[in-house]
Every structure is written in C-alpha cells, then in structure tokens.
Amino acid sequence: MYLHRKILGAVTAAAIMGFAANAQAQIEIQWWHAMGGALGETVNDIAEGFNNSQTDYVLKAIYKGNYTETMTAGIAAFRSGVPPHIMQVFEVGTATMMAAKGAIYPVYQLMADQGMPFDESRYLSAVIGYYTTTEGKLLSMPFNSSTPVVFWNKQAFAAAGLDRAPKTWGEMGEFSAKIIASGGAACGFTVGWQSWSMLENFSAWHDVSFATKENGFAGLDTELVFNSPLHVKTIGQLADWQKDKIFTYGGRRGDGNPLFAEGKCAMLINSSAYYSGLRKSTAFDFGTSELPYWSDVAAAPQNSIIGGATLWVLRGHDDKDYKGVAQFMSYLSDVFVQTFWHQNTGYVPITNAAYELTQRSGYYEQNEGRDVAIIQMSARTPTSNSKGLRLGNFVQIRDIINDELEAIWAGSKTTQQGLDDAVSRGNKLLRKFERSY
C-alpha cells in the first residue's frame, strides 16, 4: 500500500500545478497492452501515476486482447497510418519487431533524441539481454518479465515425509512417486506453456542450443536443433511418466494451473507471473523453487530465460509526442514504480535498484519464494545458449511445437519422431522469414 501511495502520491501536487497553470490541451499518448483482469488494473494504476506526475501528457492504457491480438492490431494500425505510440509485444515477437526497422523507434535512440538520461547498466542483464542489439543497445523497454519456476504443495509433500522441492529430474520422479503413494496428491506434476518451459528454458537451463547461430541472435539463417538426444530423453521421460500419473498434461498455456491449485497435482512448472494468482486460488501453503536439471549434465544448472513482454515504440508520430513517450519510459524505470509492479504481480523488477530496494525492505523474508525467479535468471552470466531466443515466425513455431508435443503425449508419435517433425516444420518457417527480410 505504501508503494501505491508513493506512485500516486503526486496527484495533489500535480493537480494544483494544473489548476495554477494556463489551461492547455494535454497531448494524448496511446499505450496498447495485453494485460486483462487484475494485471490490467495494475497497468491502469501505473498509467494514472504517470498522468499525475506531470501535466503535459495524458497516457491512455488501452487493452487490446491477448498478446497475439495486441500485436496483430498494432501492426494493422501502423499499416493504416494510425499506430499507437507504445505497443506491448510478447517475447516471441521480438525478431519480427526487430525486422520491421521502419516501424519501430528503438528505445535507446528515443531516449538519446529526447535528451533523457538512459543508463542500460541500471537494468538486470538477464532481462534486457533478450532485447538488445549485438552492441548492447536496448530496442524495447522490458515491462512484464517472468521465468518458469516450480510451485510445490507443502501439504502434499509433508504427507509423503518430504520437506523440500526436488532439485533434479531424477528427484522429480522419485518425489512424485512418494507423494502419489502417500495419497498426498493424485498426480506428481503438470507443466504450463510447455514449449517455453520444457524446451526453450530447458535448453537454457542446461546450456544447450535450442537453435543454431546463438539461438538466432547471430543470424537469420538459424536452424532449430531441439531434437538432440538430451531433449528426446527429457520429453520421452515425461511421456513415460504419464502412465503412473507422475506427469499429467494440462494444456498449452496456463490450463494446467487448476490441477495444482485444486491439489490434484503436487507440483506445477509454470511462469513466476502466476504467483499472486495462485496465492489467491489455493487453500494450501506452497513453495517456489528453481527448475529441475539433469545431474549428469555438467553445465547445468545455467540460467533460465525470460518470458512476458516489452514495450515497443512505433514510428508515425510528432516529435512532441515522443518527448512524452520518453518521459514515460523514464517514469516506468523509477525504482518505486518497478518495486510496486514487482510486488503487486508475479513479474520480476527490471532494474537492479528495484530488486535491491525489495531486498532491503524485508519483502522476500515475508513472502518466501518471490525472489526465486530473479535468482534463477541472474545468478550466472548468460551464455550464447542461455541469453534468449531471437527467431522469426516464432508464434507459429510455438504452435507447431505444441501440436507435436501433444502428439507425443497422446502416443500417436514417438518422442524422436515428434521432435524431428517439430524441427523440420519449424525450420521451414524460419527459411520463409529469412527470405522475407
């Protein structure tokens, strides 16, 4: 509550300044986003805070549907000559946005053009690395960043005589079997956003390639390689575990969350962003821990990569508009704004200062597990395999991966066949993207 007041506390002063000054029309800045429900309300709080911090601009936060719908609407608006100033785009759209050079206004360039102080070293390297040029220049402003973690039901674990989360994939199987045998839960674990959790982040966590050319960072001629023996071993293990309910497939996105929230599965591998929602929907205490790894992989654990979205600035507006956009980007990076966003959602702060402030405040001691995502992303220096993914047509590639994983779970394809087919089909889309740019 203190942080909310801190952000919005400028309302009185701003209002007084507004009444005292000569009446002038404020310049409207449109921010199209994909945050619905409670997250959308928090977005509105941030917009309100910015509006109350100055009198020249009014920021309109406009919900445009899910990530895909928002990105599609923004692209269509740009082509029609009426783009929003700011558009929220999920991480899989990064390569597409980068390729649209005439449409985007890179954040580092925006801030320089508008004379706004901008120090990229302020930001968590694990967060901004996904969205920078090869020279380390930030293209879009990270906003809602998260990473997959393991949520575990302490009550179900206690029933099996367990008091900690599994650390390795071997323990995932062992602990799940004990919990099921004890009656603590009917299922060991489920997974959400399976391509992101079980292939993209699995690869980074084990420091192996998801795709060649540094996962696409080093060139458009990248190729998918997530059909390696290690990937086949892991996905095959999950497929085998289905027989004993150690693993249960719950759906492509957050569809499996109720299996955990209702106590049916003892563990959930999904985005750290679900933390707040799970706290409200579960009747039991749960912990948060790092992703499991194979103990025989020397490089593991490395670091996980982020999901979520960033804010891209679009071309097509007057310079005076962009001055306000730059002011908002600066406001968004404020330590109190970032701390408010982090503590009121499951997303990580994007600045080192916000993380340090939250540490000093004792928040993590009072909210066990809220720092796991940050530690998991930041404890080790990212490698070429673990700094992120930059692949064209990645939205469609993820759909292909989901199709093939579901064929594996259903038993209609072997693990090797399913992953081979996903790689082959995905590479065709990469070649199509390469030819386009």
What are these regions (language model features)?
Residues 369-425:
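C-terminal capping/gating helix-and-loop segments adjacent to ligand/active sites or protein-protein/ligand interfaces
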